[in-house]
C-alpha cells in the first residue's frame, strides 16, 4: 500500500509532457548505471534524478529495503515507475504567451480537480489565439480563445 501511495506522489509531481520525458530519460540513465558502476544505489539515484523525484524514488527503495545494493529489485521498481508514468494521460493546451511554471501547475491542478485524475500538460505557445486557451484532449477540441470569439462574433 505504501508503495502505491509513494508512486502516486511521484506521478502527481509530474506536470508537463516535457517533465515526463526528462524524467523517463533520467530513469533510463539510472537503470543503466546500476550495473555499470560501483556507486551505491543512493548515490546513483541522487546523481541521476533531480528533486523532488530523487527523494521520492529513494523513499520507494527504502520502503522496500532496497538501499543495500539489491540492483535487480531496484530495476523492478524502476520498471514499475516507468510503466506508471507512461500510462499517464496527456492533453495539449494552447496559450497566447509564455506562462509561468506556477501558472502551468495551477492549470494542471484545475484539471486534476475537475477530472479527478493526474494529467500531463503539453503547453504550446500560439500568439495567433490572442488570449484565452485552446484545449485538445482525447480527440476533444475546446476553443476558449479571443481569436475564436472574434471569429464567431466579429468583435470582443
Question: Can you annotate each of these PLM segments?
Answer:
Residues 1-130, 134-156:
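Elongated, mostly alpha-helical coiled-coil "stalk/stator" tethers of large membrane protein machines
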